[in-house]
């Protein structure tokens, strides 16, 4: 089995992981010279390309010097923790990719810890050494310190390192000498990554991932730990609770380049995809038909946040989306549960409302954004952090927060974090910038990014990861300003918007259609204010023609989905449709709102 190497890639968002895989694919001649491929071949759903993050793990196989290398791409974000753990189960070694300027970042820590615990051998790639002011040697030391902190074993600390620039297509053992290709990296993989360890015994495979195809149904993906598989072979599927379901394999596929190829036989140690099994979940074992033995199932991080999903019942419902009923939304969420391991779904006493639990705002907003693009309309409530009761004490999730920002604005940022019950752990100057580390409740992180970017003129870089549950730290002040709420249904008239500008900032553009109870702006004071922006100017003969003022309107504030979710208050929803995002009050009628308050 020396002809196979299984390796996972770990990297922080935007350190060049997907670019590196592109170059490996090109080097191993996966594309004929006449094929044009986009950049970032792996990030193949639109959301991933736009945000520059990898959400779902992918598998790619290349052949180099007669040896098959299975490359498994991992999500870098702690929000997708569920994905990370099960993917690492398939690998024998990891490629840790770090930026030569930024060094190892908090998100990298999360995945690396999981990899070291699974006893995988690390290879370090210091990427982007062509950047100005980068410090590859210091980064190498920082990686060593990080692994030492994470209690790596001695053989893991003795890791090989390669330097280079994936974008410019070269890698080398010494960062000062540029080479012609990325071969030194591939040679290092062959030399240092152990071949899969093959145990004697009956067939065993843990299902670590799944795929779906409209004509073959669900496809189980995993690594065959021992034994072999053949087409039309009878197997036993062992569920998490130990029950056994006799099944039969219809088709077997191995990974080949970016796709798969159909085979009749798979040996232990290789990654494969199986068609024809029914009713399996991630974490089940495919075992021998006569003498089935289960593999230990995968433990997944618990969710830390919940959001209310409900049907769109605003006056504009059904105008923009295809799927608007609660049945559609429920079916879509149940489908998501099958492949999104870190997510949980809970029904409420109302048929139209669902509570969805996830790993953070990013994890859930990616789901909402995907649904929105598929044509769903829905409304989302304010994100709620999950508070637990442990030994009779109220506990809440605490996160480790790293902020990298210009030195002259660091004081203001530190003040913001401490107001949100954050405590400072360290402050390190890095050139003209400061890197500050804090411990802060998850509740304090919701909405922090917007404020930070405003205070630092967009220069702050913020990363956070889940640390632990600890004692509840008391109330955190939310948004100080109230909302401007529309009084009438109609279109926003520039004349009215102009007259109300001193009352606050608007979220709607002139002539945009609005409805009663929609949040159309932010009040400059604390409480909510109901305004009428549908009034036109009276054209009676009383006014002199020459004394008209020209209307000067500030451009409206536009939110992204995450910003909108972090902005809303408890009594507000975000209305999500394929073509617009609107903020609204839960109760559209003002008298009803007053009654609920009283």
Task: List where the protein language model places each region.
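Alpha-helical scaffold elements adjacent to nucleotide-binding pockets in ATP/GTP-utilizing enzyme cores
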Residues: 23-24, 61, 83-86, 90, ...
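Conserved nucleotide-binding/hydrolysis modules and their immediate coupling elements
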Residues: 204-307, 315-319, 414, 481, ...
């Amino acid at each position: 089995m020396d002809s196979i190497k299984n390796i996972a890639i770990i990297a922080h968002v935007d350190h060049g992981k997907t670019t590196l895989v592109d170059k490996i694919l090109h080097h191993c001649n996966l594309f004929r010279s006449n094929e044009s491929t986009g950049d970032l071949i792996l990030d193949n759903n639109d959301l991933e390309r736009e945000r520059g993050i990898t959400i779902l793990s992918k598998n790619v196989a290349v052949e180099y010097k007669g040896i098959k290398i299975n490359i498994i791409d991992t999500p870098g974000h702690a929000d997708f923790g569920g994905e990370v753990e099960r993917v690492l189960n398939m690998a024998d070694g990891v490629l840790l990719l770090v930026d030569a300027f930024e060094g190892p970042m908090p998100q990298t820590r999360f995945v690396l810890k999981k990899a070291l615990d699974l006893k995988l051998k690390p290879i370090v790639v210091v990427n982007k050494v062509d950047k100005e002011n980068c410090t590859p040697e210091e980064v190498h030391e920082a990686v060593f310190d990080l692994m030492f902190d994470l209690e790596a074993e001695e053989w893991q600390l003795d890791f090989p390192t390669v330097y280079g620039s994936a974008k410019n297509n070269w890698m080398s053992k010494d960062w000062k000498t540029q080479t012609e290709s990325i071969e030194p990296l591939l040679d290092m993989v062959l030399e240092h990554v152990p071949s899969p360890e093959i145990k004697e015994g009956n067939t065993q495979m843990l299902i670590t991932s799944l795929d779906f195809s409209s004509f073959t149904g669900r496809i189980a993906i995993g690594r065959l730990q021992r034994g072999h598989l053949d087409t039309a072979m009878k197997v036993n599927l062992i569920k998490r609770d130990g029950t056994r379901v006799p099944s039969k394999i219809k088709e077997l596929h191995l990974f080949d380049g970016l796709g798969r190829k159909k085979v009749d036989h798979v040996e232990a140690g290789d990654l494969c995809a199986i068609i024809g099994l029914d009713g399996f979940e991630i974490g089940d074992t495919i075992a021998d038909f006569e003498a089935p033995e289960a593999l230990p199932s995968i433990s997944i991080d618990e969710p830390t946040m919940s959001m209310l999903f409900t049907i769109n019942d605003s006056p504009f419902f059904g105008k923009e989306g295809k799927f608007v009923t609660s049945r559609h939304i429920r079916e879509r969420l149940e489908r998501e549960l099958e492949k999104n391991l870190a997510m949980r779904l809970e029904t409420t006493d109302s048929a139209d409302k669902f509570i969805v639990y996830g790993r953070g705002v990013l994890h859930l907003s990616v789901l909402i954004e995907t649904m929105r693009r598929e044509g769903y309309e829905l409304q989302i409530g304010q994100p709620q952090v999950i508070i637990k009761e442990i030994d009779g004490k109220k506990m809440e999730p605490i996160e480790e927060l790293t902020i990298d920002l210009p030195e002259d604005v660091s004081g203001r940022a530190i003040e913001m974090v401490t107001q949100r019950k954050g405590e400072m752990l360290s402050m390190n100057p890095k050139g003209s910038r400061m890197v500050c580390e804090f411990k802060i409740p998850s509740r304090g992180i919701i909405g922090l990014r917007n404020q930070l970017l405003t205070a630092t003129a967009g220069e702050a870089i913020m990363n956070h990861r889940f640390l632990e549950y600890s004692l509840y730290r008391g109330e955190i002040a939310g948004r100080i300003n109230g909302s401007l709420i529309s009084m009438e249904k109609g279109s926003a008239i520039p004349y009215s918007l102009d007259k109300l500008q001193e009352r606050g900032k608007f979220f709607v553009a002139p002539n945009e259609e609005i409805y009663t109870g929609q949040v159309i702006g932010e009040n400059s004071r604390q409480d909510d204010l109901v305004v009428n922006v549908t009034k036109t100017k009276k054209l009676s003969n009383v006014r002199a023609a020459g004394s008209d003022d020209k209307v000067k309107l500030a451009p409206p504030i536009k939110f992204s989905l995450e910003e909108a979710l972090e902005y809303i208050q408890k009594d507000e929803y975000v209305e999500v449709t394929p073509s617009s995002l609107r903020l609204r009050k839960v109760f559209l009628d003002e008298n009803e709102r007053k009654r609920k308050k009283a």
